[in-house]
UniProtKB/Swiss-Prot annotation:
Family, similarity comment: Belongs to the AB hydrolase superfamily. MetX family.
Record's catalysed reaction(s): L-homoserine + succinyl-CoA = O-succinyl-L-homoserine + CoA
GO biological process: homoserine metabolic process; methionine biosynthetic process
Xref: SUPFAM superfamilies: alpha/beta-Hydrolases
Highest taxon of source: Bacteria
Entry EC no(s): 2.3.1.46
Job of this protein: Transfers a succinyl group from succinyl-CoA to L-homoserine, forming succinyl-L-homoserine.
Organism: Neisseria meningitidis serogroup A / serotype 4A (strain DSM 15465 / Z2491)
Pathway: Amino-acid biosynthesis; L-methionine biosynthesis via de novo pathway; O-succinyl-L-homoserine from L-homoserine: step 1/1
UniProt name for this protein: Homoserine O-succinyltransferase
Residues the entry annotates as binding substrate: 224, 353
Subcellular location as annotated: Cytoplasm
InterPro entries, A to Z: AB_hydrolase_1 (IPR000073), AB_hydrolase_fold (IPR029058), HAT_MetX-like (IPR008220)
Length: 379
């Protein structure tokens, strides 16, 4: 399906919101910006809009290229575009960079209007609820009364679920992919180790590293390297790299010897070049705090009791970060609450990252579901 046409050259838009946003922690952003991209056309009935919510390291650039010279397309270009599962010839698709991000939306790199300086570590901790609240403001700005679908993988899937709970009347369908109704203890532990790598980097400077012309590159690199391991499946990693060495024989030192070591260093270095450490801290805390059942006596069934959306839930067989059993929890709760849900477990060797990759069964399942969403738009 990815051989079909791309959305082409796209231009991001920064949308200013000159209004306060009260956050879940009680703090208030006096104003905020959201960076977005849109693909396709909103129909006259305004009932064909689809919101794409990104995962930890994602952003608004879902599909296409920003210039003809761009080496890479958007992070979900195989999913979003003409003739693709989320078809931009049928749907008006919106991608955004969440609050706390580092790609144009208000976050640690933004100017604090109260001080005239970058927020840095002073940018408040944000939650999935806060993101959805800001996305609702964007929905109003775009003149959309109800999303045909809210779609997301991993942390993005958590946002899709929260949308159905916070604004049940504004979502017709939720596609929750490779996600979970809350993080496991192990995942919280992984996130804390990643944060400690950043927080203990001597160049972190209590989060105000940019004002001191430093970057906690070592900590962010290690955080990404460890995170990247958890996104991959052991078998897939073994088949790709095995125990292959970069040169003939062991070097009997502590440099890079195995191909897998070289790969992880490359991924870490690349990440440091495009991502902000404070944003990484914020995103992982949003993951940790997400637990919609906590507001309903720790009952996920009660949490989804009032949702009006129909659900598509997908998991991947080798995803051990967000294992299929976590999706089963959501599916069981939806069934217990007598909600409409379709579920698929995709056999894949790619672990958690499979939701970003082109798997025929996965793509066909999403395409079939979105085809039915489109048919509803025509009624």
């Amino acid at each position: 399906m990815s051989q079909n046409a791309s959305v082409g050259i796209v231009t991001p838009q920064k949308i200013p919101f000159e209004m306060p946003l009260v956050l879940e922690n009680g703090k208030t952003l006096p104003r905020f910006d959201l960076m977005i991209e849109t693909y396709g056309e909103l129909n006259a009935e305004k009932n064909n809009a689809v919101l794409i919510c990104h995962a930890l390291s994602g952003n608004h650039h879902v599909a296409g290229r920003h210039s003809a010279e761009d080496k890479y397309t958007g992070w979900w270009d195989n999913m979003v575009g003409p003739g693709k599962p989320i078809d931009t010839e049928r749907f008006f698709v919106v991608g955004l960079n969440n609050l706390g991000g580092c790609d144009g939306s208000s976050g640690p790199l933004s100017i604090n209007p109260e001080t005239g300086r970058e927020y840095g570590a002073d940018f408040p901790v944000v939650t999935v609820k806060d993101w959805v609240k800001s996305q609702a403001a964007l929905t109003d700005y775009l003149g959309i009364g109800q999303w045909a679908a809210v779609v997301g993988g991993s942390l993005g899937g958590m946002q899709a679920l929260q949308w159905t709970i916070s604004y049940p009347e504004r979502v017709r369908h939720a596609l929750v992919i490779a996600s979970a109704p809350k993080l496991s203890t192990q995942n919280i532990a992984f996130n804390d180790v990643a944060r400690q790598a950043i927080l203990t980097d001597p160049d972190f400077n209590e989060g105000h590293y940019r004002s001191r012309n430093t970057v906690p590159a070592r900590g962010l690199r290690i955080a990404r390297m460890m995170g990247h391991i958890t996104y991959l499946a052991e078998d897939g990693l073994g088949k790709k790299f095995g125990r292959d060495l970069r040169s003939n024989g062991y070097q009997y030192g502590y440099g890079v010897e195995f191909e897998v070591e070289s790969y992880l260093r490359y991924q870490g270095d690349k990440f440091v070049g495009r991502f902000d450490a404070n944003t990484y801290l914020l995103m992982t805390k949003a993951l940790d705090y997400f637990d919609p059942a906590a507001d309903f006596g720790n009952s996920l069934t009660r949490a989804v009791q009032d949702v009006q959306a129909k659900f598509f839930v997908a998991s991947f067989s080798t995803d051990w970060r967000f294992a299929p059993e976590r999706s089963h929890e959501l599916v069981k709760a939806l069934i217990a609450a007598q909600k409409s849900v379709q579920y698929i477990e995709v056999k894949s060797a790619h672990g958690h990252d499979a939701f970003l990759m082109e798997d025929e069964a996965y793509m066909r399942a999403v395409a079939a579901y979105m085809n039915n969403v489109y048919k509803e738009c025509q009624q």
